[in-house]
Design a protein with these regions (language model features):
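Short hydrophobic alpha-helical runs that function as membrane-insertion/retention elements
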Residues: 168-172, 226-228, 291, 373
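Glycine-rich beta-alpha junction loops
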Residues: 43, 175-177, 222-226, 230-235, ...
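Conserved beta-strand termini and adjacent loop/short-helix elements that scaffold enzyme active sites
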Residues: 95-97, 229-231, 293
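Nucleotide/pyrophosphate-binding catalytic subdomain
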Residues: 1-216, 384-389, 401, 405
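Conserved dinucleotide-binding and phosphotransfer motif residues
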Residues: 32, 88, 222, 286, ...
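A conserved regulatory-domain signal marking ACT and ACT-like small-molecule sensing domains
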Residues: 237-408
């Protein structure tokens, strides 16, 4: 009998009516001849409220105790979902990550899955039960509760689908699929019927909030078909698959916007082996995640200019770090450009089509939008633009590539 894994996010189980709606979806899948595993997030904003409570009690709560606290949110929701299914007359059982055999490393609040023992789940499924698993959590080898970090319930669902060799992993959320852009910012955005794992991974890494990149990576690695659809309607969603049909015929599949970026530039660094390594080692030690790294060498070959982007940090903190780096590594001077946003276009068709960059930059030029940095990869072109121009830039590139017209 085929196995279906269904994941329900916090908004999809935010209250009793939505919990009953999720329960009915699981029962429907069971009656269609499937064995059903549900992965459920904490209700609504429960995780945020629990985190706030922790910081009211302690200025620096232990990560281990944070995991103990945050994991309770999912335990509430899985029990309520099991009750709703039982109320409808069907057998169901709720399990925590530890009870389901989801083993992780010991990196509290950012744990990574090491293995899943599926024996208990399979036994329960063979008994005809719907199994409801708490997302976002696991247990390490010393039986400490761990949590998987941002997007943890998505990761739980895809990992379970892979371990169980499920027919599909269905992600139920408050949107009805993956769009060519955020429809709140681009009213002309269209829903995609299918998208490749590579394209979805890039979109998720660059601001698309439908799914977390880590779960997409798992789906790609283990060949898990992922269906993203609304928990509130029966509208067809989006299928994320290894190779989308006509993948290279569509040049650009989607566009994204990320806010809150800054650009740090160090001028006149000595052009010596190990300089860049030392700079980024210092940044790593301060837990600063950087990207869009660029280095240019001066005409005399003696000095280099090194620049990189940073997201989500206070300007004062960045200035202090930049000054420290400039002093330590003997930079001539440095600059910080804050209040930037990143606009990206993603499409597997870029591999075989020419003129993508020209069309993107032409659209931005027509809107008189300044470009502060350009970064490219095989299927992505990203630009940094002034934050006040960000939405206009997103709308311009979306229109330039016909994403308001193209269905995929």
């Amino acid at each position: 009998m085929p196995i279906i894994v269904q994941k329900f996010g916090g908004t999809s189980v935010a209250d009793a009516p939505r919990i009953h709606l999720a329960a009915r979806r699981a029962v429907r899948a069971l009656l269609d001849g499937n064995q059903v595993v549900m992965v459920v997030s904490a209700m609504g904003n429960t995780t945020d409220r629990l985190a706030q409570l922790a910081y009211q009690v302690s200025r620096r709560p232990s990560k281990r105790e944070l995991d103990m606290l945050l994991a309770t949110g999912e335990q509430v929701s899985v029990a309520l979902v099991a009750m709703a299914i039982q109320e409808a007359g069907y057998e169901a059982i709720s399990l925590t990550g530890a009870q389901v055999g989801l083993l992780t490393d010991s990196a509290h609040t950012t744990a990574r899955i090491q293995s899943i023992d599926t024996a208990r789940i399979r036994r329960l499924l063979d008994q005809g039960r719907i199994v409801i698993v708490a997302g976002f959590q696991g247990v390490d080898r010393d039986f400490n509760i761990t949590t998987l970090g941002r997007g943890g319930s998505d990761t739980t669902a895809v990992a379970l689908a892979a371990a169980l060799r499920a027919q599909a992993c269905e992600i139920y959320t408050d949107v009805d699929g993956v769009y060519t852009a955020d429809p709140r910012l681009v009213p002309a955005a269209r829903k995609l019927e299918r998208i490749s794992c590579d394209e979805m991974l890039e979109l998720a890494s660059r601001g698309a909030q439908v799914m977390h990149a880590r779960s997409i990576e798992l789906g790609k690695k283990f060949g898990v078909p992922i269906h993203v659809q609304s928990s509130l309607t029966d509208s067809p969603g989006t299928i994320i698959m290894d190779q989308a049909p006509g993948m290279e015929e569509v040049v650009v599949r989607g566009a994204t916007l990320e806010r809150g970026l800054a650009r740090v530039t160090l001028f006149g660094l000595p052009n010596e082996p190990g300089t860049a390594a030392a700079v980024f080692d210092e940044l790593a030690g301060r837990a600063l995640s950087v990207d869009d790294i660029a280095q240019t060498v001066a005409a005399d070959g003696r000095q280099v200019t090194l620049s990189f982007s940073v997201q989500g940090h206070e300007e004062g903190e960045l200035r202090a770090v930049a000054e420290l780096l400039a002093q330590r590594f003997h930079a001539v001077h440095h600059s910080i450009n804050t209040d930037l946003a990143r606009v990206s276009v993603v499409g597997a068709g870029m591999r075989t089509h020419h003129g993508v960059a020209a069309r993107m930059f032409g659209a931005l030029a027509a809107e008189k939008i300044r470009v502060d940095n350009i970064a490219t990869s095989e299927i992505v072109i990203s630009v940094l633009v002034p934050a006040p121009d960000a939405e206009r830039a997103l709308q311009a590139v979306h229109k330039a590539f016909g994403l308001d017209r193209t269905t995929s």
